[in-house]
Amino acid sequence: MAELEFEKPVVELRNKIRELKDYTKNSQMDFSEEIRILEEKLENLEEDIYGNLKVWDRVQIARHAERPTTLDYIEHLFTDFFECHGDRLFGDDAAIVGGIAKYKGMPVTVIGHQRGKDTKENIRRNFGMPHPEGYRKALRLMKQAEKFNRPIICFIDTKGAYPGKAAEERGQSEAIARNLFEMAGLTVPVICIVIGEGGSGGALGLGVGDYIHMLENSTYSVITPEGAAAILWKDAGKAKEAAEAMKITAADLKELGVIDEIIPEARGGAHRNILKQSENIDLMIQKTFQQLNGISKDELIEKRYEKYMKIGQVSFSNASIWIK
């Protein structure tokens, strides 16, 4: 498993413990006490490092090559998943996957950004950066879900919508804007979960819902830290400083009222234990459905409207104002 820069002390100590255990197997000497001391030291070191992650550390975890994707969570959380393809206008976009599934026996529609696991798959899925047809496919599935009264669950994980010439010619901005407009008025429950990177309008195209949750080490922002640094300081190398200033972590966004709940991650990140991570997401989905249970369609839309009208409201000297 690929290790991140800030994890090196942990990796080195793990390797030392492993080497000592291997040596003990082929030796008459007893190193059990030394191993116990090192394992205790490792526990404390992991607690210190993973319990005090910096913003840039979380950015790296969110981008980890082995971080679970939408399809990974679909496999662990849902049954009878049937993937649907195409937007019925241009083509199919592999950067967004979606279809019909069952969640604990209840029919649902599941949609999400999809990155690749290796170079070949990343090229096929355009590194998780959707074209307009991806967003139109997602909207087609959402309207289908509304027609058949199925709740919608969206998994968000993209650096952003694809900014290429062909995507712009096919109406990238219109496709995203249309999704924002239509999702705001859907008469079925919509749960959105940021599982990795939530980048710019590319994330928002699947991000209008009744509840917005984020995994503990995911990020959600209007632009990547590198992009912000390049604009502000003409130096993408200052991405760490930009990340600190942008308020892109789950904790920051929970405090600002942009998201509703933070879903805990396995120590070291979701990629360390996908079964445990899936359980954590499962618990949050169950809790959210309980909160949405019994709400009428009119009330659902009204509460969704109120939710988004509150975002951006701040207070100075006890006087509320709107940021415009």
From Swiss-Prot:
PROSITE patterns: COA_CT_CTER (PS50989). It catalyses: N(6)-carboxybiotinyl-L-lysyl-[protein] + acetyl-CoA = N(6)-biotinyl-L-lysyl-[protein] + malonyl-CoA. Residues 37-291 form the CoA carboxyltransferase C-terminal domain. Its main location: cytoplasm. Keywords: ATP-binding, Cytoplasm, Fatty acid biosynthesis, Fatty acid metabolism, Lipid biosynthesis, Lipid metabolism, Nucleotide-binding, Transferase. It comes from the Bacteria. One of its GO terms (cellular component) is acetyl-CoA carboxylase complex. Its EC number is 2.1.3.15. Pathway: Lipid metabolism; malonyl-CoA biosynthesis; malonyl-CoA from acetyl-CoA: step 1/1. It is found in: Cytoplasm. This is Acetyl-coenzyme A carboxylase carboxyl transferase subunit alpha. It comes from Bacillus cereus (strain ATCC 14579 / DSM 31 / CCUG 7414 / JCM 2152 / NBRC 15305 / NCIMB 9373 / NCTC 2599 / NRRL B-3711).
